Design a protein with these regions (language model features):
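Outer-membrane beta-barrel pore domains
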Residues: 1-140
Length: 140
């Protein structure tokens, strides 16, 4: 699955205003590697965990994502944002594993790295952010 968007906004800070156009994209690829059927609605485990079958396996999915945000250079050159405190580009790459216990419960574990470029003090980039996070999703 992939998305691309362009956002145009008129920004006014104090007496300074300008119209800026930012763009962003996201690409995600996922694979059901064990015991499930994929669809655009929800993953359906072939052997779901229920109260009657607590030793069932559920379904396992691997996911990889890439996303990017590009801010309009006019926002910095016309004084709307401070180039010494902000970056104009962020790129994120992530991998994850999802465990679908059944139709209603999903456990997620993901790792992401975000690289920031084109900005910050004296044009030095901010350090890369790294995050490991987990989530439990209940859908009904």
């Amino acid at each position: 699955m992939a998305e691309y968007t362009i956002s145009q906004q008129k920004i006014k800070i104090g007496t300074t205003s300008d119209k800026v156009a930012n763009d962003a994209l996201q690409v995600q690829i996922s694979w059901i590697i064990f015991n499930g059927d994929a669809s655009f609605r929800r993953v359906q485990p072939r052997n779901p965990v229920t109260f009657e079958s607590l030793n069932a396996a559920g379904a396992i999915q691997l996911v990889t994502r890439y996303s990017e945000l590009n801010l309009d250079a006019k926002a910095f050159t016309h004084g709307l944002f401070n180039p010494d405190r902000s970056v104009s580009r962020a790129q994120d790459f992530g991998v994850g594993i999802n465990w679908y216990l059944n139709h209603n419960i999903k456990l997620q574990l993901s790792y992401n790295q975000t690289h920031f470029t084109h900005g910050a003090v004296a044009r030095f980039d901010r350090p890369t952010e790294k995050i490991l996070f987990s989530r439990m999703q209940v859908a009904f």
